[in-house]
């Protein structure tokens, strides 16, 4: 058993990225039944090894605190520093990547269209998580306690932290759904061409996405409280989900299934449905003189569709291990089983891997756009080199809405001016 734990600790140290740790579970021992050791954009495993149950905290379902596993968990110093380094890396990449993406879309008029507006909304949600949540995660990892735990600001952070975590994931999920719908609309209206700009319907969608994401995150702000506990003779407080009402008890019971269904399955199902419809639409309109005339636009729209599909696949790969771990713990794990300890240690390892991958999703979208989209690749290179508008050579590029745009020097003739604002409708 001791050798097994050494192996687990070793692999956790290797695969551990940022512990995107939601204070939802401050467990004291492997055998304690915890609501959700991990949730979205973070959940945490206990960083403090203790055998004291926090006071004012609901006991496990059987009302007992016995049947501990013979081994306890602890976070080694090496593991903390490894995760801190990776966390800082994700912070830098997420800050630079998402901020640059927002700047590109804001400063280039040819990039201001429906799908790019949704991508900007996606990047802004990731940026909020990176700027606010990651520093708190690193502090908790190194200090082993909740920041400002003894004053009111700590209580404010306890409410804000999980609220922003869940809101950020909601923004990601709903924007991916909106992008899938947008791609189908673009193909269904493939003969329509209109000017540059963000359609009103897309602006309404984005506002609705943010409002709905905040509303769905309200239970997190309500349920998370500062819970006092004793550790090594000293009094501490930590932030965790503590169900004190019937609604919160219900929310706590169905939370894993709710997260899996709405925050994971829904964008995948939505993408599958609308991409199937989009494929059928393309096959049905494969012939015809109008299609031949607009073949370039159709080709560009297919490229955009592939980019959106790539973002959805990355989302699925990043979040699947975490959801799988949560569902296995909900369905297979039995806290009263005497042989549960090895299973729980495996689930904890899956939690670490899943948490790290889920956290990386907040910085990977700009990287994916760089490699998938030639237009974004050119803009990233020019923007990061501080020469976005200083190019003296003619550059022909394809924005995310599938339009052929030409950038010309002021000295050149204006006979292509109309083409510079030519844009096919994807909305």
Curated annotation (Swiss-Prot):
The keyword Signal applies. Residues 1-20 form the signal peptide. GO terms for cellular component: plasma membrane. The modification Phosphoserine is found at residue 425. Residues 405-427 are annotated as: Disordered. InterPro entries: Endthln_rcpt (IPR000499), ETA_rcpt (IPR002175), GPCR_endothelin_rcpt (IPR051193), GPCR_Rhodpsn (IPR000276), GPCR_Rhodpsn_7TM (IPR017452). Its main location: membrane. The keyword NAD does not apply. GO terms for molecular function: endothelin receptor activity. Glycans are attached at residues 29, 62. One of its GO terms (biological process) is vasoconstriction. It comes from the Eukaryota. Residues 416-427 have a biased composition (Basic and acidic residues). PANTHER family: ENDOTHELIN-1 RECEPTOR (PTHR46099:SF2), G_PROTEIN_RECEP_F1_2 DOMAIN-CONTAINING PROTEIN (PTHR46099). This is Endothelin-1 receptor. It comes from Ovis aries.
